[in-house]
């Protein structure tokens, strides 16, 4: 059973990576090492009180499994209260409330396999892909990794020195392909925007689609969609494409701080009132949902239940639970794939009850 409790962790280090990003390392006491054991590509949910607000945000782990460290990369975001606070104010020795690692943005390691893994990253989307890349190179000695990495310019590139060190260590197994939107390079392929056309150029030349065993995509919302479309058009099977989303599509001119959670609306067919049983840590608690409440997550929080959540936008998947009984409708879903939905998993921050009786388990995640 995956823990969804917060634990106080001491900040070991806050290291500047670029002018807009820091790397935060945590000290994990011996009694919590099992709880904070992670799989490459997973994320941590941090919690903090900032200007009187109880905020939670998820940040991807950037360490490989063999690094012996727990660390995340945090980039400043225009209007992003938590990320900007971390960059400006978090210090070594501070204590942060941290939830155990979560996420399914990975493929199990196969030490004996000879596979070609491809990462397509944009900006801070490199963070989970770096974790995957380091782990694959260390634990699948016959496999190779190709990274297509988009940024505005070299100076704003996160983890550039660490990635170059990896290239020097795995010269025959790691291929790095940088793309800059604001800085020309010697190769026309290396200049431009990470859209479907640009990624398609790579798939038709330097990174033949037929050679790809698994592709990992993480970056801005539109880049994710366009990279997926390019891979599918090139013939990469859908089940070999893995996507991690950090946010929703922003309207033109909007900032991350201006676009919050989705506006929920009751629809015909939604239950006007429902009895919801919440299962967490083996305990059951019944609450009443009324039509005016935005979601089951909101109803649970209003009833005083401590339930896991982070973005409340249907993106991160922290609020995921298993539908044991009844039927719900999700407003939107960017975190669960079709197999997970078919298996009964829902995002409680987006869920409205349809039946008058619903049982949800946070212990089955």
Show which residues each predicted segment covers.
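C-terminal accessory/binding modules appended to enzymatic or scaffolding proteins
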Residues: 269-312
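A short, sequence-level motif marking secondary-structure junctions
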Residues: 40-42, 60-65, 290-296, 335-337
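Iron-sulfur (Fe-S) cluster-binding segments and ferredoxin-like electron-carrier domains
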Residues: 301-303, 308, 318-365
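Iron-sulfur (Fe-S) cluster-binding modules
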Residues: 1-3, 10, 20-22, 233, ...
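Ligand-binding loop in jelly-roll beta-barrel domains
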Residues: 65-68, 110-115, 140, 353-362
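Ferredoxin-reductase
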Residues: 2-95, 99, 112-115, 151-153, ...
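FNR/FR-type flavoprotein reductase catalytic core
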Residues: 84-268, 275-277, 284
């Amino acid at each position: 059973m995956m823990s969804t409790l917060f634990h106080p962790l001491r900040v070991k280090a806050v290291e500047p990576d670029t002018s807009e990003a820091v790397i935060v390392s945590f000290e994990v006491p011996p009694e919590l090492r099992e709880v904070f054991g992670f799989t490459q590509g997973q994320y941590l949910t941090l919690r903090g009180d900032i200007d009187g607000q109880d905020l939670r945000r998820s940040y991807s782990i950037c360490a490989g499994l063999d690094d012996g460290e727990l660390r995340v990369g945090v980039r400043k975001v225009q209007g992003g209260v938590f990320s900007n606070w971390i960059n400006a104010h978090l210090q070594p020795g501070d204590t942060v409330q941290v939830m155990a690692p979560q996420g399914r943005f990975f493929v199990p390691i196969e030490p004996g396999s000879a596979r070609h893994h491809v990462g397509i990253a944009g900006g801070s989307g490199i963070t989970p892909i770096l974790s995957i890349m380091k782990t694959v190179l260390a634990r699948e000695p016959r496999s190779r990794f190709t990274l297509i990495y988009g940024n505005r310019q070299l100076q704003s590139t996160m983890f550039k020195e660490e990635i170059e060190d990896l290239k020097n260590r795995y010269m025959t197994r790691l291929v790095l392909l940088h793309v800059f939107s604001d800085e020309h390079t010697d190769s026309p392929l290396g200049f431009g925007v990470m859209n479907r056309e640009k990624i398609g150029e790579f798939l038709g030349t330097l990174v033949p689609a037929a050679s790809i065993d698994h592709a990992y995509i993480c970056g801005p919302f539109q880049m994710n969609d366009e990279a997926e479309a390019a891979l599918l058009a090139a013939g990469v099977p859908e089940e070999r494409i893995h996507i991690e989303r950090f946010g929703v599509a922003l309207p033109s001119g909007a900032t991350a701080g201006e676009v919050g959670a989705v506006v929920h609306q009751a629809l015909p067919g939604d239950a006007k009132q429902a009895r919801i049983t919440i299962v967490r840590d083996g305990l059951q608690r019944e609450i009443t949902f009324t039509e005016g409440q935005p979601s089951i997550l909101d109803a649970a929080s209003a009833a005083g239940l401590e339930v896991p959540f982070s973005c409340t936008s249907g993106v991160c998947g922290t609020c995921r639970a298993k539908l044991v009984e009844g039927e719900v409708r999700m407003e939107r879903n960017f975190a669960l794939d079709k197999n997970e939905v078919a298996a009964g998993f829902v995002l409680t921050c987006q869920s409205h009850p349809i039946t008058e009786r619903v049982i949800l388990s946070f212990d089955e995640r």
